[in-house]
């Protein structure tokens, strides 16, 4: 399978938060606030402390299962407007408690709870990655200092790997100065996964010149070509 081809494989763990419906999950969706993502989704209720405990425990159990089936690492989804991303977004989170307000340390608190609990579980020994993006938050005032604070908090909680999301790996942010992966590498020494429309040796080499990637993630790119990784490796080794 994947490992025989020389690749590393991990599994991403997500909680949809308000971006689901009662028919899909069996109960009213929960989110950081009362939200409605559209006609295909139900209006969420604001999560309470009991919900937090259940959410965290579900992430821990999912990480345990990832370890059991032989994953090389497990990744927490903090982007794609899933629950942890909803908490981080000012437009979607209007709480005034420890999981809200304008402070980034409050908006990332649920993610910290998840990471802390997974790292404390002795049955989970594989590395923990955190998947995040900030492009949709910049217009709402998300600054480099917020990125630095967020990464520092997550690193202190136990994140082993960071995985910044960009539509294209080379897309620049914060006044169009540098790609997100480059900004992230300024604020953490943890290994970095880069992805974002990397579908050719040329694009991979361009991304590699940034000098901040330890791994390059391939997802949809490999579906059409099962030998895609070996093809790419041969091209680069030439």
Describe the residue ranges of each PLM region.
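Flavin-dependent oxidoreductase catalytic cores
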Residues: 1-238
């Amino acid at each position: 399978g994947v490992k025989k081809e020389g690749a590393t494989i991990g599994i991403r763990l997500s909680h949809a938060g308000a971006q689901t419906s009662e028919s899909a999950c069996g109960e009213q969706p929960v989110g950081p606030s009362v939200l409605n993502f559209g006609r295909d989704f139900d209006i969420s209720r604001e999560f309470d402390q009991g919900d937090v405990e259940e959410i965290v425990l579900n992430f821990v159990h999912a990480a345990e299962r990832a370890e059991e089936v032989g994953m090389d690492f497990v990744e927490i989804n903090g982007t794609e407007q899933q629950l942890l991303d909803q908490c981080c977004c000012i437009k979607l989170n209007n709480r005034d408690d420890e999981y809200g307000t304008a402070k980034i340390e409050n908006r990332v608190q649920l993610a910290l709870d998840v990471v802390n609990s997974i790292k404390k579980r002795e049955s989970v020994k594989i590395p923990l990655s955190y998947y995040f993006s900030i492009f949709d938050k910049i217009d709402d005032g998300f600054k480099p200092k917020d990125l630095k604070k967020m990464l520092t908090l997550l690193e202190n909680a136990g994140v082993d790997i960071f995985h910044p999301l960009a539509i294209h790996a080379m897309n620049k942010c914060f006044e169009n100065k540098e790609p997100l992966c480059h900004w992230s590498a300024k604020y953490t020494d943890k290994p970095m996964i880069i992805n974002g429309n990397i579908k050719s040796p040329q694009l991979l080499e361009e991304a590699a010149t940034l000098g901040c990637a330890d791994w390059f993630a391939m997802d949809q790119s490999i579906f059409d070509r099962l030998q895609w990784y070996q093809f790419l490796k041969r091209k680069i080794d030439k």
